[in-house]
């Protein structure tokens, strides 16, 4: 049974992970894994990159997110995608699905993990750099943010940035990872995007 706690309603901003939380990128991920060994910027790599981005462009938000998007818009909540993926990918998905009502063009709300001031930032191994960068860019305090992700590393990185974290189980493919999240006593678990609304009311 998933764990749920009452979240303080004085939040100001929501951080969403991209791959496996907001968007179903499973087909793009499979393609990327098959081409991991390619040397960067070779003709083969460029062709593989082009096909990967085509898969990304075809990716859609998981079922249930439309209700969450409406809740965010209706309640004037600030939302941001904070991901280790590139900003190019995040922008492409937002544009392809026309999500500018949720992530407006004229605001900083897509924080990519690569090439931020020349440094690659990830949430791996609980590194909070990406979250700290997002807090600074959006000018919000960590206690005013809730982060939603589909991996233990997302929660650990949020913890180290002082942000409340929630596990999202719908995009978790590995059973071991899913069980780790279910057994985690320190973070809420939810099994559908619609439960985000229940947590925030």
Where are the predicted features?
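Glycine-rich phosphate-binding loop signature in dinucleotide/nucleotide-binding domains
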Residues: 7-9, 75-77, 138-144
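Short acidic-hydrophobic, aromatic-tinged amphipathic segments that line or gate anion-handling sites
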Residues: 187-195
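Substrate-recognition "cap/lid" segment bordering the active-site pocket of phosphatases
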Residues: 87-146, 152, 156, 160, ...
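Short glycine/proline-centered loop/turn elements that form peptide/ligand docking sites
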Residues: 22, 66-67, 131, 151-154, ...
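Short, acidic loop-to-helix structural element flanking the phosphoryl-transfer center
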Residues: 53-81, 87-94, 128
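Active-site neighborhood of HAD-like aspartate-dependent phosphohydrolases
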Residues: 2-47
């Amino acid at each position: 049974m998933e764990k749920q706690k009452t979240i303080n309603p004085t939040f100001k901003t929501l951080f969403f992970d991209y791959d496996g939380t907001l968007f179903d990128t499973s087909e793009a991920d499979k393609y990327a894994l098959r081409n991991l060994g390619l040397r960067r910027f070779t003709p083969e790599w460029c062709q593989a990159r082009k096909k990967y981005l085509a898969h990304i462009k075809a990716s859609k938000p998981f079922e249930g997110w439309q209700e969450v998007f409406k809740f965010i818009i209706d309640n004037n909540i600030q939302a941001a995608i904070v991901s280790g993926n590139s900003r190019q990918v995040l922008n492409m998905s937002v544009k392809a699905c026309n999500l500018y009502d949720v992530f407006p063009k004229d605001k900083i709300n897509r924080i990519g993990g690569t090439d931020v001031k020349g440094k690659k930032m990830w949430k791996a191994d609980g590194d909070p750099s990406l979250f700290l960068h997002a807090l600074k860019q959006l000018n919000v305090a960590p206690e005013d943010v809730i982060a939603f992700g589909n991996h233990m590393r997302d929660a650990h990185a949020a913890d180290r940035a002082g942000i409340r974290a929630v596990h999202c189980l719908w995009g978790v493919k590995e059973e071991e990872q899913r069980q780790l999240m279910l057994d985690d006593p320190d973070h809420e678990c939810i099994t559908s995007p619609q439960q985000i609304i229940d947590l925030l009311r």
